[in-house]
């Protein structure tokens, strides 16, 4: 029996175990909550709790509540690691409010189930099968064995990366802001960057514009964003097989390939489109190295991070549309980022390639990708695209009297659904109804369109109904 066949049987056994658990009947005849629904409700509960905490007067720098809408919007953006905001966190939030915001970012980025597992391990409680299934779902893993150990490794790795990033940022921020504030800004920025959140405490909506000619700051943030968006499973596999890269899994190879293409291609495109723009990379005093750094930073940050080293509104429309495409793709599975994910794009392109070449199978790097994966990639992309189009149309109606361009509305919508957090229109300047509309969009982007759809719609199990076959008939396509 080959290795792939054994893996397929193992994966089928795990899926059957999950289905059996979901179908198991309780003594009162009630089915336990499905993992997808539990995750959706868990994130929703975390958002509501965070919104209430941020609404407290103690969370405000002025001692008065920032208001429920602003508190809820900020909590949604933080838990969904987006970065869109109606407030200036560094100016409007007290130290308590900033700590709450940082905790929401960290829990939202690494996953609340991972934190719950850590808590149960620390107090010595046994991790139940249901908790292991939820942990597996939240971390986008197929297996159940070793999940607790894997989640603890994730925590250790995340902490090490964030502290290293904070130490590097402190080399520039401490001399500029003083020891106490500089260290706090370094830690907050490092966590926000690794979690692909995009929140900052520098104030005045400037994000990292003040550091556009500070290579150490920008490259440190680039590294944190890339590591957070790569996915923990990929990082672990690279560490395990660092001396034998030929043994890497198909998943890791696709992640690295797509990420490399988007990074190099996106950086080059931004450099060509914005290199002569006096409002962005072509401003006076920018050296060639500054332009290269700014181009790479824009190509990386629009992959769901949300930090800005150039004014997003001042970019050319062509650059905004390019950024929308990169935001829509986003990061990789089992990462802190959003978007449809790099592997989804890879599966789509490989599916199209197989259709054009007249092949029945989807292949890459000498391996075959299942038809189910191809169907899921198409479904995920279709659902996400539908939401982008629907919300963009709604925003264009709501903002028709405010003079916001369609390009900026598309940018805002894609930024929300991909949990990126970049804004060209200025989220705080939109109508209240538009701001409310963006909140469920950020939530959708964090839990995932397919996860939310399966949580709301009862899926048919592999029963008699699924085994019914109808007569096949061809229709015309294209």
Where do the language-model regions lie?
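Membrane-proximal intracellular helices of multi-pass ion channels
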Residues: 1-478
């Amino acid at each position: 029996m080959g290795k792939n066949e054994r893996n397929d049987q193992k994966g089928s056994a795990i899926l059957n175990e999950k289905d059996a658990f979901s179908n198991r009947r309780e003594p009162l005849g009630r089915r336990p909550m499905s993992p997808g629904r539990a995750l959706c409700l868990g994130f929703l509960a975390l958002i509501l709790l965070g919104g209430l905490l941020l609404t407290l007067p103690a969370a405000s720098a002025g001692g008065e509540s920032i208001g429920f809408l602003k508190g809820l919007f900020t909590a949604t953006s933080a838990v969904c690691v987006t970065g869109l905001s109606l407030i200036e966190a560094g100016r409007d939030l007290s130290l308590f409010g900033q700590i709450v915001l940082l905790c929401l970012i960290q829990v939202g980025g690494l996953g609340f189930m991972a934190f719950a597992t850590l808590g149960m391990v620390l107090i010595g409680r046994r991790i139940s099968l249901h908790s292991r299934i939820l942990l597996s779902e939240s971390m986008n893993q197929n297996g159940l064995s070793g999940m607790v150990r894997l989640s603890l490794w994730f925590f250790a790795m995340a902490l090490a990366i964030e502290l290293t990033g904070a130490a590097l940022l402190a080399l520039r921020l401490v001399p500029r802001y003083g020891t106490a504030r500089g260290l706090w800004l370094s830690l907050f920025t490092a966590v926000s960057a690794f979690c692909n959140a995009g929140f900052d405490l520098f104030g005045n909506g400037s994000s990292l514009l003040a550091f556009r000619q500070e290579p150490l700051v920008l490259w440190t943030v680039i590294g944190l964003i890339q590591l957070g968006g790569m996915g923990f499973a990929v990082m672990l596999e690279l560490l395990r097989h660092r001396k034998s890269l030929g043994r890497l899994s198909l998943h890791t190879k696709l992640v690295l390939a797509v990420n490399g293409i988007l990074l190099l291609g996106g950086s080059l495109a931004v450099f060509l489109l914005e290199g002569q723009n006096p409002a962005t990379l072509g401003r006076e005093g920018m050296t060639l190295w500054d332009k290269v750094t700014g181009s790479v930073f824009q190509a990386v940050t629009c992959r769901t991070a949300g930090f800005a080293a150039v004014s997003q509104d001042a970019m050319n429309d062509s650059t905004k549309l390019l950024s929308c495409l990169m935001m829509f793709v986003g990061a990789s599975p089992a990462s802190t980022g959003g978007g449809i994910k790099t592997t989804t794009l890879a599966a789509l392109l490989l599916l199209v390639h197989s259709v054009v070449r007249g092949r029945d199978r989807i292949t890459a790097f000498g391996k075959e990708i299942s038809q189910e994966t191809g169907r899921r990639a198409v479904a995920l992309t279709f659902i996400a695209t539908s939401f982008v189009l629907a919300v963009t149309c709604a925003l264009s109606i709501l903002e028709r009297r405010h003079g916001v361009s369609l390009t900026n509305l598309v940018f805002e919508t894609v930024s929300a659904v991909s949990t990126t957090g970049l804004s060209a229109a200025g989220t705080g300047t939109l109508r209240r109804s538009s701001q409310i509309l963006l909140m469920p969009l950020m939530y959708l982007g964090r839990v995932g369109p397919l996860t939310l759809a399966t949580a709301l719609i009862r899926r048919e199990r592999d029963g008699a109904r699924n085994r019914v076959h109808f007569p096949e008939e061809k229709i015309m396509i294209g």
